[in-house]
């Protein structure tokens, strides 16, 4: 036997475990920062302050880094991710709304029906200034009727009936309802991606997990409905998709843009039945829902707020033409120039919705077309708020979000950061710099990025994802091209058999 001392074979150093441990430690640190920032935004931060804007930006960067690390190599377990997101959502629910008073407007419109037996399309909260919760309503909205659809008015009426005159019970009803909508959306994202990175990307976003729930914004319901409609459209269930889009439109009118994505994707799939059923069903539901309230609803919508919001791309032309902080200092007076811009912004949103839905319709799934069409409003509108991006974020969440999804995700954070800035402070260098970046430069950059990525970035991916050009496209065990992945327990063997059966039936 050779002497063991003569064996000069080098022994490899155990480098793997330290590397894994270091990567895991970094993720735990990032997770702690993301949860801490989310909790701070939801439960501690003042409504508007430069420090809050900085925390929003830090939270966004942390969440992005964490999601990218998990996409490259998953390390965090599902339970860990769920607990982290749950902590943020819980902190958002237990604290009264801090960054928005929308909940009290919802309550006022609901109580008009449940308590005063009046229509929120023909009356305003000021007509009932003796109401138990009237003092909670923001003065800006006390003389405006409901711009929300009949489905949400009915939902708010039911909630305020159950809550009675209790302000705490009322705000908890809306906050917990939106928390439930967020949780269901995250569960559906997990069901179709099986990706903790996708959950982190969506659930720890400072807008989606913290601000949306704490404010009790009904946009969470719209985002859930848009996601469900995409899942139904992918399964060629046009009537069901139309029902969901119609009901979402009866919550907020811009939800109808999701139908543009369904129609575009159906056109590419040469599924005229899907297109017709979705359009006919959604149109019928919206018509029937609004018909009893049409005169009052039309009057309210015609007089809707035409203010330029801080994150809107129309800040630059409004400042040039009107001045006075893009006309915001003149509120409630609205100069004619802002009214013209409002109509132009709606036209731009429509053009973007149709154009980008058309460019993204070649994907295997309708998610991109529906998400692009829906997000067009938040990118182009004169009056756009951070929580409006919740309409498109769930449907764009994926194992590997597209460049378009990243643009919408980033714009959402920038809108929230701009919204958190305080009122103008003369001479504050940091504030003025952030105001210039977030309210003037960022919205224009978001429009350019959204358009370029939508036209060019998604176009390059179409050929590789089109089943005609990609014979290796995965199919689920049911034979549908993969909206929902094969459930656990139905592994590659069954998927392979399904592919063989499909191939034999086509040959």
Functional labels for PLM-detected ranges:
Residues 2-58, 278, 287, 291, ...:
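Transmembrane helical bundles and short interhelical boundary loops of multi-pass, membrane-embedded
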Residues 31-44, 59-103, 117-120, 283-294, ...:
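Transmembrane signal-anchor helices characteristic of membrane glycosylation enzymes that use polyprenol
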Residues 61-68, 169-196, 351-357:
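Transmembrane-helix motifs of polytopic, lipid-linked glycan transferases
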Residues 75-175:
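Intramembrane catalytic core of multi-pass membrane enzymes that act on lipidic substrates
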Residues 80, 189-207:
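Transmembrane-helix signature of polytopic, membrane-embedded enzymes
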Residues 150, 164-184, 336-345:
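Loop-to-helix entry region of an early transmembrane alpha helix in multi-pass inner-membrane enzymes
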Residues 257-284:
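Perimembrane helix-loop-helix junctions
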């Amino acid at each position: 036997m050779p002497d063991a001392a003569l064996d000069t074979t080098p022994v490899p150093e155990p480098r793997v475990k330290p590397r894994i441990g270091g990567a895991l430690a970094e993720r735990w640190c990032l997770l702690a920062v993301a949860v801490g920032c989310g909790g701070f935004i939801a439960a501690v931060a003042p409504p508007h302050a430069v420090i809050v804007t900085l925390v929003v930006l830090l939270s966004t960067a942390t969440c992005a880094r964490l999601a990218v690390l998990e996409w490259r190599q998953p390390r965090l377990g599902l339970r860990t991710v769920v607990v982290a997101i749950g902590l943020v959502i819980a902190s958002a629910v237990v604290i009264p709304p801090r960054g928005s008073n929308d909940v009290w407007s919802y309550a006022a419109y609901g109580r008009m029906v449940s308590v005063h037996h009046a229509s929120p399309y023909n009356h305003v909260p000021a007509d009932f200034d003796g109401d138990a919760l009237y003092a909670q309503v923001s003065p800006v909205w006390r003389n405006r009727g409901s711009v929300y659809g009949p489905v949400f008015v009915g939902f708010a009426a039911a909630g305020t009936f159950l809550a009675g005159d209790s302000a705490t019970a009322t705000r908890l009803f809306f906050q917990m309802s939106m928390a439930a909508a967020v949780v269901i959306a995250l569960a559906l994202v997990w069901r179709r991606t099986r990706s903790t990175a996708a959950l982190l990307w969506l659930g720890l976003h400072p807008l989606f997990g913290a601000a949306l729930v704490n404010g009790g914004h009904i946009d969470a319901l719209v985002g859930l409905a848009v996601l469900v409609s995409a899942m139904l459209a992918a399964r060629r269930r046009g009537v069901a998709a139309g029902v969901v889009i119609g009901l979402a439109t009866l919550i907020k009118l811009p939800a109808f843009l999701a139908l543009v994505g369904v129609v575009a994707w159906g056109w590419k799939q040469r599924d005229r039945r899907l297109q017709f059923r979705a359009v006919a069903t959604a149109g019928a539901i919206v018509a029937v829902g609004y018909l009893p309230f049409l005169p009052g609803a039309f009057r309210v919508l015609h007089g809707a707020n035409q203010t330029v919001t801080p994150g809107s791309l129309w800040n630059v032309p409004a400042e040039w033409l009107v001045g006075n902080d893009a006309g915001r200092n003149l509120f409630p007076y609205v100069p004619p120039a802002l009214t013209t811009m409002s109509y132009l912004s709606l036209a731009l949103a429509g053009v973007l919705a149709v154009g980008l839905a058309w460019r993204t319709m070649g994907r295997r799934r309708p998610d991109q077309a529906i998400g692009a069409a829906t997000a067009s409003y938040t990118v182009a509108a004169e009056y756009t708020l951070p929580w409006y991006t919740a309409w498109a974020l769930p449907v764009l969440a994926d194992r590997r979000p597209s460049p378009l999804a990243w643009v919408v995700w980033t714009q959402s954070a920038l809108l929230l950061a701009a919204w958190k800035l305080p009122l103008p402070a003369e001479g504050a260098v940091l504030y003025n710099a952030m105001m210039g970046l977030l309210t003037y430069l960022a919205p224009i950059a978001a429009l350019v990025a959204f358009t370029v990525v939508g036209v060019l970035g998604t176009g390059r991916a179409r050929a590789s994802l089109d089943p005609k050009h990609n014979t290796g496209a995965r199919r689920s065990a049911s034979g549908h091209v993969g909206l929902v992945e094969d459930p656990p327990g139905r592994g590659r063997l069954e998927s392979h058999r399904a592919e063989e059966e499909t191939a034999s039936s086509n040959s």
